[in-house]
Amino acid sequence: MKLLLISPSNRPGRKVLKAIRIPQLGLHILASLTPDDVDITVMDEQIREIDFSLDFDLVGITCMTATANRSYELAERYRRKGSKVVLGGVHPTILPEEAIRHADAVVFGEAEGCWADVVDDFRKERLQKFYRAPAPDLSKYPAPRRGLGIDKTLFNCVGLVTTRGCPYSCEFCSVTDLYGGKIRHRPVSMVVEDIKQSGSKTFLVLDDNVAGHPEYSKQLFEALIPLGIRWVGQSSISLAKDRDILNLCRQSGCAALFFGVESVSPASLAGMKKSLKSIKETEESVKIIQDHGIAFHPSIILGFDTDTDAVFDDTLAFLARTKLPTMALNVLTPYPGTRIHRRLKEQARIISDDWSHYDHHTVVFKPKNMTPQELAEGYRYVQKEFYSFSSILRHIPSLLAVTPVDLRRALVFLLLNFAGKSVAKYIDTSLDWADNREKWRAPEIREDEAATGGAPSGLTGR
């Protein structure tokens, strides 16, 4: 039996910079749960093009909303070749009836809970249309089966999971739809063994909140200290309030953390169930975390209902005050299944159901206090200003300001700056923004416009 596991791209042919590539993990976990006599191939379309000359008996495709269209295209292509196709991931979990139109089977939830049944049913020619996977006990599953595809990045960084689930219930987030609102842990001993078996000293911890359960985090960080590893991950900003955990986090080898700042608008923050309710608290937390030797990488979202056009300059001012050298900037994206999608749908404010546009770059809804075009151009403005060449030069001292000085971290963050500049250029040259129209037309890739004879209008200056 020949099995293919695919992680698709929503922009086929556009490769991701090696320095910021997120190591694939989910498919390698499925591979570890597959019988040894199965010939397994893993393909990550962010790294290289899929080789359609190869034939497979069973194809599994992991599907996010932004990659749904591409996932369906790949599924149909392999079905025409005679393969059976299984779709899984957050998008099929939310919209299984849509997904099954393009596949032979759909998995709800975390596939580890039913993957053995899927493979067994396929072999016995009794593949079911739907498999509902219970939330798995993470202590019962082996380490990922690495080495089947390119699952490493710059500095031999590999993916690692210690927990799943998130106790927060943000209106715009789909994490709890897939993993639930209760944090589940892998036994610390299993995490340590996984690290030792990986052969790497550099890790990207893919948990949604690596410090979400202080007691577990303390045990984990203490166990990591003797291993001498380096890692980056994601945490809630409330970590700044627990100095003991913060100290252990740094001692365990943490070089940087991704934090959901979400907004620099006090009105927007007030509407969220966040531990910090003011920009002053956020700025104080940035300083505390960086004073502990951990670089702070913020995620900021534009387009909340309380945002006005002042939010764009306010965002740049916040980044300047905190001297943060990197950021992840996103347009608010109302994923299907989330509370915000249901609310905006009820208010007739969703303006695109093309899933490839749900990519954090594209405006797919009508904002409350500005037009879709104003939000799109404001997003472009912030991205372009922050990652301009002159701004990157100003960021360099900040790259070395977090002590102890970490040259590898500084190099990765510098590469993140150039990746951000590349994203700004992509937005500027590859997306077609609407002109003066009452209804926003979501952007298409320039090549698609050219193929249909359309002429992109281009981005106007702010």
Q: Which positions does each model-derived feature cover?
A:
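Structural detector of well-ordered beta-strand residues that form the stable sheet scaffold
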Residues: 86-87, 107, 129-131, 232-234, ...
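Radical SAM [4Fe-4S] cluster-binding motif and immediate context
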Residues: 143-297, 302-304, 308-317
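Acidic, low-complexity intrinsically disordered segments
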Residues: 1-199
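Structural recognition of alpha->loop->beta junctions
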Residues: 98-117, 248-258, 314-329
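Hydrophobic anchor at the start of a short beta-strand
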Residues: 3, 40-41, 85, 203, ...
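Alpha-helical structural signal in soluble globular domains
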Residues: 33, 37, 77, 81, ...
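Radical SAM enzyme core and accessory elements
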Residues: 2-5, 36-42, 122, 150-152, ...
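Flexible glycine/acidic-rich beta-alpha junction loops that bind and position SAM and/or redox cofactors
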Residues: 8, 12-13, 98, 215, ...
